[in-house]
């Protein structure tokens, strides 16, 4: 198989409208799952939030899953209610949590991000991605 044949063979077909509706439903479900994780973290105290605690691990998953949504092309049209700066902050926090380790994480900023900023972002994204029947 040459390169031209390979390109044709692996070119994705255009998505149908039904698939886009399913994408929206999947996005809303994932945003709600992230919100549940945020609530789990918020139910703990700041004093008990540290590297190695369950809440810290759940908070890391909040950031990792939220950042992953912005990398999915099928969700792009539903994720416009967030600023460029917010996207960069989420990606940076995810990179610290996932790649450089928690030693370089500022726990106070991480706590504030997950318990204050992320809920505000989730509210906007859920509102934006909700279908007319859900508003």
Go through each PLM region and give its residues:
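Solvent-exposed interaction patches of small proteins and small membrane subunits
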Residues: 1-135
């Amino acid at each position: 198989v040459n390169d031209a044949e390979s390109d044709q063979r692996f070119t994705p077909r255009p998505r149908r409208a039904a698939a886009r509706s399913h994408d929206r439903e999947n996005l809303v479900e994932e945003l709600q799952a992230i919100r549940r994780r945020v609530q789990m973290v918020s139910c703990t105290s700041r004093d008990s939030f540290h590297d190695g605690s369950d809440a810290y691990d759940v908070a890391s998953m909040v950031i990792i899953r939220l950042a992953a949504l912005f990398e999915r092309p099928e969700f792009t049209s539903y994720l416009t209610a967030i600023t460029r700066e917010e996207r960069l902050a989420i990606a940076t926090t995810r990179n610290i949590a996932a790649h450089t380790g928690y030693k370089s994480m500022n726990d106070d900023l991480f706590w504030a991000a997950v318990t204050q900023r992320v809920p505000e972002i989730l509210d906007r994204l859920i509102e934006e991605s909700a279908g007319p029947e859900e508003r």
